[in-house]
Each structure stands twice: as C-alpha cells, then as structure tokens.
Amino acid sequence: FYEKIQKAGITNICIHKGLLPSDYEESFKGSWEYATVWDVAKAAKDWPGLNFIIYHSACQQFLELPDNQLAHFEATGEIKWATDLARIPEEHGVNNVYGEIGTVFANSCVTHPRLAAGLLGTLIKGLGSDHVCWGTDSPLYGSPQWQIEALRRLKMPEEYKKKYGFAGLGAPNGAIKNGIFGFNSARVYNLDVRSSMGRLSGDKFAAIKKEVQVAGGFRTNRSNAAYGYVNTA
C-alpha cells in the first residue's frame, strides 16, 4: 500500500482517529483500538517520506459534554489518545506526524476554552506548532467563522504554562495561529501561499469581498452564527 502511494507521488496520508462514545469498549468491541494511535508510530518510522495527518488529533471524546474531559485533563495533564499522539515524535524519533483539530476544537473552544487551550498546548508541545493543522468539520457545524474567531481570541492560561510547560499561543494574527490556520497545511501540500497572494488578491473571491466591504464592511455584516445540520426528529 505505502509503496504504491509513493510510486503515485502521494505524500500525505490522512487518517480518521478518535471520536468514539464513552461506551466505546462495548459499542465498538473488537474495533475501537483502531481509533487510537497504536499503529501510527510504526508507520511513521517505517515510511519517513510520508506525512501522517491524524484527523481530530485522535481525541476519544464524542457526543458528550467536555466537562469530564476537562476535569480529567486538569487532574492528569492528559487528553485521551491526543496525548498519546503528541508523545510519538519524542518517543519514536519521527517528525512526520501531524494533528488536525476538526470537531475537537469546535466541541470545546466556546464553552470550554481551557480544554481547547489544553488540547493545543498538548499538540504544540509534542508535535510542534508547525505540525498542527486547522480543521472545522463545517459541513456538520456550519459556517466556521465562530471557530476562527475563537482561535484568534484563545490564550494559554498562565496556570497551564507553569503546570504543563506549555508555550503561549501568540498574537491573534501571529505566526503560531496563522500557521495552524493554513501555512502548516500549505507546506505539507507543497502550496506556496505567499507567492500566490498577488493572484489571489484579484480573483473572484476578492471581488466578492470588495462588494461586501462597499455594502457595509465585514465588521458590520459578519456573523458568528452557525448554520449546519439540524436534527428535527
């Protein structure tokens, strides 16, 4: 499989991990282990020319409030399975493992920002700030503007810096957050965003943006409302 991928010129392997209910050992009996990162380290070490991008950063919790996860993190300093992911580079000597934060950031960034900060701190400390990739799962959560705003505003609690050795997240428009928002993924996919800015500034989306600005500006019309899937059953 990996040999065929490399022969085809593919360098990025995106793998869905985590996101299981609390009763996963019973409801996913015989298969839940594949949602953990037990198999990532060997693959990354055996195939250093490939990038392994772990979706949802392998966070286990799903379909429940983050209260228990936050309490567990503040008691132990660990986020189930995401901490295991973050330990892989140091424990196995690899630098081709990435953490994507779709859904798991959305689940906590507004109601439990300390957990969101703990997640980012864990990933940045273990994987490196340049190995954390943005994700919103917006087909499920609707317009991602509220998630973008949340990351721009999020700060690392001083308590976490002292207790866990986490670095700060930097300025709202700083290198760390801009890297997470796009530059990290651009590098992985060999996209030179900076050299393309000239062309992008004159494309169709730029024209639409200009129309909105003329009509009142993004600061006036922009909304953090989320429009996504709604279960009416």
Features from the language model and the residues they span:
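Catalytic pocket-lining loop regions of alpha/beta-barrel enzymes
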Residues: F1-W134, E159-L169, N173, T220-S223
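Mid-to-C-terminal alpha-helical segments outside catalytic/metal-binding sites
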Residues: T122, G126-C133, Y141-A233
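Active-site glycine-centered loops adjacent to acidic/histidine catalytic or metal-binding residues
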Residues: D137
